[in-house]
Structure formats: structure tokens, C-alpha cells
């Protein structure tokens, strides 16, 4: 479970970085009406790159915890802590989809749900 969650987190972060720097207008167009100015792109890149690096950092953190080979009870606590983190991210994503007319694209939402479910599964089964 550790490497799968790690890969999901890193994949989402790298995808966000690629999207915001290779095609910022294409990434932002669904959320803005009218022309997207260079100032708006610059402002958004400054926020999105921090968010993306946070995702990558969490992925690397989870990967390093996997490599430390904790006992199953410790793994259970790690997965529970990750589930709380991922659940918070999921709540924000769902709120944005339902009430704000935005949120992550559906494939990313599926990855967030998958990572949260894997964390919950790991917290119950206490496996690595």
C-alpha cells in the first residue's frame, strides 16, 4: 500500500506541475471566463507549484516511511494519519465540485479517492 499511495501522490504532483507550466491556459480555461492574463497565469503558477510540490513531498515521505520497515501496529497508525490528511483533501475537492463549480478533474478526483481508500484499508488491516 505504501508504494501505491506514494506513486499516486507523486503522479498527481508531477501532472499538476506539467499542466501549469506547459499549458497554463489550457489548465485554467475551464475555470475562467474571458481572456486569461499573464498576471493571472503568474499568480496561479505561484500557488499551484507549491501545491504540486506538497503532493510530491507527501509521496516521497510515504515512500521513505515504507522503506523504514515499521511493525504492523506502527504502519496502522501511519495509514490512519494519512487517511485523515487525504480525507481532508477529499472533502475540499468534493466541496469545490459540488458547491463552487470547480475542483480537480475527474481522473485526479478518482486518484484522491483511491489513495484515501487505500489509507483507510491499511489502517484497518495493518499491512505494509
PLM region descriptions:
Residues 1-5, 123-126:
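N-terminal membrane topogenic signal
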Residues 2-8, 51, 78-86, 108-111:
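Hydrophobic alpha-helical transmembrane segments of polytopic
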Residues 8-53:
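Hydrophobic transmembrane helix segments
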Residues 11-15, 85-94:
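Aromatic-anchored segments of alpha-helical transmembrane domains
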Residues 40-67, 84-88:
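Core segments of alpha-helical transmembrane spans in multipass integral membrane proteins
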Residues 66-82:
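Loop-to-transmembrane helix junctions at the membrane interface
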Residues 90-108, 123-126:
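Membrane-helix boundary connector in multi-pass membrane proteins
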Residues 114-128:
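Membrane-water interface at the C-terminal end of transmembrane alpha helices
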Amino acid at each position: 500500500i505504501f508504494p501505491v499511495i506514494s506513486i499516486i501522490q507523486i503522479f498527481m504532483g508531477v501532472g499538476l506541475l506539467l499542466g501549469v507550466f506547459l499549458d497554463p491556459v489550457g489548465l485554467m480555461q475551464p475555470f475562467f471566463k474571458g481572456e486569461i492574463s499573464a498576471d493571472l497565469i503568474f499568480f496561479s503558477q505561484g500557488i499551484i507549484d507549491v501545491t504540486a510540490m506538497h503532493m510530491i513531498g507527501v509521496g516521497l515521505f510515504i515512500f521513505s516511511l515504507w522503506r523504514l520497515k515499521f511493525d504492523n501496529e506502527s504502519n496502522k497508525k501511519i495509514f490512519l494519519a494519512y487517511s485523515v490528511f487525504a480525507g481532508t483533501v477529499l472533502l475540499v475537492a468534493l466541496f469545490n465540485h459540488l458547491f463552487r463549480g470547480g475542483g480537480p478533474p475527474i481522473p485526479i478526483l478518482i486518484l484522491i479517492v483511491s489513495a484515501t481508500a487505500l489509507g483507510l484499508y491499511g489502517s484497518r488491516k495493518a499491512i505494509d
